[in-house]
Amino acid sequence: MQQNFAQKQMSKVFDGKTKIVFLGLDFTQAKFIGEEGFKDPYKLKTYYLSNWNALLEEEYAKYNLPLNSLKARHYETNTSDLMVLNDAIEDIEDAIINGSHYIDEKDVQKAVRKYKLSDNKGIGVSFVVESFNSSLEKAVVWVTFVSMSNGSLLYTERMEGKAEGFGLRNFWA
């Protein structure tokens, strides 16, 4: 039954009529790999987590987001709900590691269950961050579709991308 609901909701993503809400980057499952690339945990939490979301919200057309191809007439961005979760991350120092880090669909589901969405119409899209790896210059995120009406996970897929840009903020955007 849940799968039928998810399939029906996901078909709406491509109909051009359903409101699509970009929810932002969810860092609750993330690790920042390569201590040399992330030297200031305080600034990472208090500046970069919110600024990466703000950058994607304000300049989404500039970035190659998968959402740009959905042709939604009712496209919005609202990163404030996820920023509450990102702001609540404790011990950001523990998120900076040398090594590897992987999450799976169960971890994404765990993250989505914590979403308290202020809007209840349409389909939300979040990027659940698995890792920003400064050694490999690679970002790994789970592109995640969520029902705004009940917060259920509709679909998620792991994606990797090369980090590039000038300065730490733009490098990871």
Q: What is the predicted role of each segment?
A:
Residues 2-95:
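A structural "domain/chain start" motif
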Residues 20-23, 143-145, 151-157:
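Generic structural hydrophobic/aromatic packing signal, biased to beta-strands
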Residues 27-30, 130-135, 161-164:
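Solvent-exposed loop/turn segments at secondary-structure junctions
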Residues 39-45, 144-148, 162-163:
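Short, low-complexity, polar/charged sequence segments that are solvent-exposed and flexible
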Residues 85-149:
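Surface-exposed short loop/turn segments
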Residues 149-173:
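Short secondary-structure boundary motifs at beta->alpha junctions and helix caps
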